[in-house]
């Protein structure tokens, strides 16, 4: 996935800078799910729910000054889901995959030796990929059509350091998605548990 590859490159760049001059750099891999209102029908159109599914999250953040910094994350759904009972132009049930991504200002603190916490706010997007049984080729070949929506994002987490600088981190995220007409609600929540490592001076 292009967004995932771009995010990995960004994380590597942040890690390089962090080891040189930052207070702290965190990198993590997480698994979680999305919660949103149930599907609805207004008599004319049916609106599926975004709830459910396993999401993989790749995240990184870097703190520079007075516990302030920036970070980013990308969260694709692990498997394709069925878009309600909609049948596409090829006569088969429509499959789709959501991808959430965001870039944030971050405030993070460590408490004693075992705990830390972060709060964040920023912008990002929701990339909805609707899959087709054939590939379309331009500069690259893909078998999906994307519907992209701008999103605001807020989130918070709690880090527990279980071994040195390695941590487990429960997280909660809230997205305000603009013009998310494909689904029943524009504001899904994402809940994740991540495992990661904090790179600090002297690690």
Placement of each model-derived feature along the sequence:
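Gram-negative (and chloroplast) outer-membrane scaffold detector with strong preference
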Residues: 31-37, 56-139, 149, 160-162, ...
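Short glycine/proline-enriched turn or capping motifs at secondary-structure junctions
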Residues: 4-6, 183-195
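Polyanion-binding surface elements
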Residues: 157
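Short catalytic helix/loop segments, enriched in acidic residues and glycine
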Residues: 48-57
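Extracellular loop and loop/strand-boundary signature of outer-membrane beta-barrel proteins
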Residues: 41-47, 86-94, 137-144, 179-184
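Cleavable N-terminal export/targeting peptides
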Residues: 1-24, 202-203
């Amino acid at each position: 996935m292009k967004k995932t590859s771009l995010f990995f490159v960004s994380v590597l760049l942040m890690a390089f800078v962090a080891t040189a001059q930052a207070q702290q750099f965190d990198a993590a891999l997480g698994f979680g799910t999305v919660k949103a209102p149930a599907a609805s029908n207004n008599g004319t159109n049916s609106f599926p729910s975004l709830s459910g599914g396993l999401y993989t999250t790749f995240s990184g953040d870097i703190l520079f000054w007075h516990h302030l910094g920036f970070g980013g994350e990308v969260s694709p759904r692990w498997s394709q889901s069925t878009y309600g009972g909609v049948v596409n132009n090829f006569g088969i049930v429509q499959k789709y995959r959501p991808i959430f991504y965001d870039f944030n200002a971050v405030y993070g603190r460590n408490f004693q030796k075992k705990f830390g916490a972060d709060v964040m706010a920023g912008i990002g997007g929701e990339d909805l990929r609707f899959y087709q049984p054939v590939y379309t080729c331009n500069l690259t070949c893909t078998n999906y059509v994307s519907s992209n929506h701008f999103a605001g994002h807020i989130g918070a987490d709690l880090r527990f350091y279980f071994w040195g600088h390695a941590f487990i981190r429960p997280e909660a995220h809230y997205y305000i998605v603009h013009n998310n007409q494909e689904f029943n609600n524009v504001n899904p929540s994402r809940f994740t548990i991540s495992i990661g490592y904090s790179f600090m001076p002297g690690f």
